[in-house]
């Protein structure tokens, strides 16, 4: 028996096929890779429930452009658009004028934006320049860990731009 690519058959089917293998077939690097795929699938599936519409947004803290820690829950009482983006992301930069327009339209109506950058440490200056050049006047944070950004992982971000709109109680009311 052999295992079929999970993209073609789905992770559940991969798991079923793996579970039906004989014990001696479950040793070695290929078996470890298959286990890793199955475990990653369930981890992402579980993480997704935390960021579904209606869920309370997972709290996180990251440093702002001045190195000061900012916690998402400190914005409770306002509508918050969490905007995951990066200076190197063309679609993000193209979307920034729309985010600026929304911010300017609603900033006096109990609304703000929290930008979360997926830039790298070596791209910090480019991130700061993009904030200035794109007129992003709201709070910006990042741990400068690229796709390993802790908040992005918590929110199961696989592509950017990505957005989550929170109500004043911190509940997710819309995405993207």
What role is predicted for each listed range?
Residues 58-63, 128-169:
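Short, internal strand/loop/helix patches
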Residues 1-70:
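Oxidative protein folding and maturation machinery
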Residues 173-176:
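Short beta-strand in the C-terminal region of the ABC ATPase nucleotide-binding domain
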Residues 76-78, 108, 136, 157:
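Active-site acidic short loop of glycosyltransferases
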Residues 70-93, 99:
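Short active-site neighborhood of thiol/selenol oxidoreductases, capturing the structured segment around
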Residues 94-134, 144-153:
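Structural microenvironment flanking redox-active thiols in thiol-disulfide oxidoreductases
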Residues 60-80, 105-106:
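A short beta-strand-turn-helix
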């Amino acid at each position: 028996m052999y295992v079929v690519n999970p993209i073609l058959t789905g992770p559940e089917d991969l798991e079923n096929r793996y579970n039906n293998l004989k014990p001696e077939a479950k040793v070695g690097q290929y078996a470890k890779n298959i286990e890793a795929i199955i475990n990653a699938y369930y981890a992402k599936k579980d993480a997704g429930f935390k960021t579904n519409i209606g869920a309370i947004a997972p709290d996180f803290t990251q440093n702002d452009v001045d190195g000061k820690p900012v916690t998402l829950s400190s914005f409770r009482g306002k509508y918050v658009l969490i905007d995951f983006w990066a200076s190197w992301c063309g679609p993000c930069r193209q979307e920034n004028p729309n985010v600026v327009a929304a911010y300017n339209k609603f900033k006096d109506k109990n609304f703000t934006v929290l930008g979360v950058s997926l830039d790298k440490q070596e791209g910090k200056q480019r991130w700061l320049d993009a904030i200035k050049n794109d007129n992003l006047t709201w709070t910006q944070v990042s741990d400068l860990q690229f796709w390993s950004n802790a908040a992005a992982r918590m929110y199961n971000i696989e592509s950017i731009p990505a957005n989550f709109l929170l109500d004043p109680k911190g509940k997710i009311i819309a995405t993207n």
